[in-house]
Amino acid sequence: MSAEAMHAAASAAPKMDPLHHFMVQKVVPIEIAGIDLSITNSTIWMWLAVAVAFLFMKWSFRGRAEDKLIPTKMQSLAEMTFTFVRQIVDQNIGGAEGRKYFPAIFTLFLLVLFCNLLGLIPGSFTPTSQLVVTATLALSVFFFATGLAIVKHGTGFIGFFVPSGVPPMLLILMVPIEIVSYLSRPVSLSVRLFANMTAGHTVLAIMFFFAATLPLGGLLMPAAFATVFTGFELFIGFIQAYIFTILTCVYINDALHLH
């Protein structure tokens, strides 16, 4: 085959761009007073995640509203999810105090979970693969916990950065470390979720691309691996929602008790 023919064949072959489905694209351009308020694919899929979470809970407990004795499978799944998050709150904040924050924490868990899982649908978009989304969620948790600590303890909140039992001479070193550690919380919380969602979905996209470009005879192994990895990504999506939720509870507990 001549060099020209090889070049033409290479040009005709489909190009792999595993990061293409992470691109934020404007769907409805909107600009007000020079501020870009466009509705993007990320916005739409976040709305869908909220809608799915709402419908999941509404349909799940429809049987209870109708006084049915035997719960449906959907209701059982919703009750398991409800109990699972409530146990996280009870273990990391405490029963009486934690229940006040349970609705917000449960909503946050469902939002992160469905944002993660909806991204596995072919042709969809994963909002939590965008650092601006995860950073917004993490900063919301951070500012809420910080505000809660200031309201509850006032100037006593400063004591959070002074480790107990540390010699006075070491406080010069330890206090700045504690402050930096505290300020890095939203960074670690957001980057962890963003990095895991981006990495996992990128590998999955590469596997499906190779499976689609191989002849039928060599298709089975990559397709099987991609299917198994999809199941693994479902697990990762759940685990990341769990980690985000449990760290939120830890930060709220620190704000309440200055641990």
Curated annotation (Swiss-Prot):
Annotated InterPro entries: ATP_synth_F0_asu, ATP_synth_F0_asu_AS, ATP_synth_F0_asu_bact/mt, F0_ATP_A_sf
Annotated keywords: ATP synthesis, Cell inner membrane, Cell membrane, CF(0), Hydrogen ion transport, Ion transport, Membrane, Transmembrane, Transmembrane helix, Transport
One Pfam entry name: ATP-synt_A
Source organism, top-level taxon: Bacteria
Gene Ontology MF terms: proton-transporting ATP synthase activity, rotational mechanism
Subcellular location field: Cell inner membrane
GO cellular component, one term: proton-transporting ATP synthase complex
Similarity comment: family membership: Belongs to the ATPase A chain family.
HAMAP family: ATP_synth_a_bact
PANTHER family: ATP SYNTHASE SUBUNIT A
Protein name: ATP synthase subunit a
Annotated source species: Magnetococcus marinus (strain ATCC BAA-1437 / JCM 17883 / MC-1)
